[in-house]
């Protein structure tokens, strides 16, 4: 599929968002409105107009959405999409902190895994309580 046919599948508002000049873009819309399709088209448009895929960072709320976006762009562009990065907001922030912890006042920090979280939770709450971690939502 060519970039023109991909853009041709979008409505007017989606096409405007997909073809914005090389600048940051925030796509906010309700469920089922075509956000993913628009973001895929935007990434494909940027790559097809000369932006290296490695210079594009796509943010998504879930890992599934981030993975789906990258897979769809690769499906449309093939090797040109190599290096495209999409991640969750959390993963992106963790990446930034790992790269420059001193900027965030986090030098020497450690991220703990779920087992360590449970052990800490038990110590704080008391071992006789439930072993279930609270829902993070």
Short names for language-model regions:
Residues 1-104:
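P-loop NTPase Walker
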Residues 21, 77, 81-84, 102-137:
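ATP-hydrolysis module of ASCE/P-loop NTPase motor domains
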